[in-house]
């Protein structure tokens, strides 16, 4: 390996890294290690000591992404991911809320999509009647049917980060967690402007990282939403606004995905499994490796696996 760089960080960032590289994790972990991940031209090894080693041709670029990640001090007592000062009140399920959710972060092909939705408390019975629930429990046909009705019922803001721009931002040192934070904040900001002068009783974000880390990702942004903002994992079960956001995000993602398949001239699979590697290899043969950034998230391990299939 041509390069080796070691950085010192903390358990919060290492947990974010493990989540970021979840599709590239190696089954083998060295003694004293937390995880090892292999991405194109770089192997990342995180240790219990807080040290993280980057080895390979892209070691410097990969390490740079994490040297810019805000670091928070270690907490002596391990807390639940939902144990923080941003936890929603017990009554939130009956409140008028803006909810936001994202899809596409675990898919090799296709964009990242974030949607924020405002649901007035008086609309909750209607949303239940429409069948609004977590989009993971609905197939594409059900998503489409419910989403088409939701579009005329609730105010929303939808943002799509296409693959080329995603890869460009990632190469500039923005990890996926930061990109998600930027999109959530922007979608919420757009929606609040859209529904003004109406003010929601709160904003609920489907939690993908600790709230303090989320806000540190937004440190350089001019507009950051902080007033009555709550975070909860499985937010779609906490308030229907998040479930509605999840459905509209999935609806947008499916539409974008179908367009991408047409552009590729072949069906593209979702997810990040072996069938994705095979499809990516076929796509490279068909259109050339130069066009791959238009279709995929290059930092996924699937990139390297696809090229391996072509050897």
From Swiss-Prot:
GO terms for cellular component: cytoplasm; ribonuclease H2 complex. Coiled coil: none annotated. It holds the Pfam family RNase_HII. Its main location: cytoplasm. It is found in: Cytoplasm. One of its GO terms (biological process) is mismatch repair. Its EC number is 3.1.26.4. Keywords: Cytoplasm, Endonuclease, Hydrolase, Magnesium, Metal-binding, Nuclease. InterPro entries: RNase_HII/HIII, RNase_HII/HIII_dom, RNase_HIII, RNase_HIII_N, RNaseH-like_sf, RNaseH_sf, TBP_dom_sf. Its cofactor is Mn(2+); Mg(2+). It comes from the Bacteria. It is an enzyme of class 3 (hydrolase). Endonuclease that specifically degrades the RNA of RNA-DNA hybrids. Belongs to the RNase HII family. RnhC subfamily. This is Ribonuclease HIII. It comes from Bacillus anthracis.
